[in-house]
Amino acid sequence: MESVQELIPLAKEMMAQKPRGKLVKLYVLGSVLALFGVVLGLVETVCSPFTAASRLRDQEAAVVELREACEQQSLHKQALLAGGKAQEATLCSRALSLRQHAS
């Protein structure tokens, strides 16, 4: 608030001294840049909840994908183990059947 109160006397003093064109252009440029910064700050403040929500959704989606990948890996491992056990059982039954025929 202090800076706004200081700007009004500064503007009055500048107008009383009849400033040169370059100085006025410089002050106008500074004012426009300051106003642009304020607008960007307001836009960022207004939009920040939406970006935080989208980040949270992205993180949740990544967690779900990781869980699905882990489940698929465990199912694949179980399938391999079950397939290996079935093959062993087949080989054992064949061996037993061969023994029965041989005797």
From Swiss-Prot:
This protein's GO CC annotations: mitochondrion
Principal subcellular localization: mitochondrion
Pfam families for the chain: G0-G1_switch_2 (PF15103)
Transmembrane segments: none
Subunit structure: Directly interacts with BCL2; this interaction prevents the formation of the anti-apoptotic BAX-BCL2 complex.
PANTHER family recorded: G0/G1 SWITCH PROTEIN 2, G0_G1 SWITCH PROTEIN 2
Subcellular location: Mitochondrion
Name of the molecule in the record: G0/G1 switch protein 2
The protein's role, per its UniProt record: Promotes apoptosis by binding to BCL2, hence preventing the formation of protective BCL2-BAX heterodimers.
UniProt keyword annotation of Mitochondrion present: yes
UniProt keyword annotation of Mitochondrion present: yes
GO biological process, one term: positive regulation of cold-induced thermogenesis
Keywords assigned by UniProt, alphabetized: Apoptosis, Mitochondrion
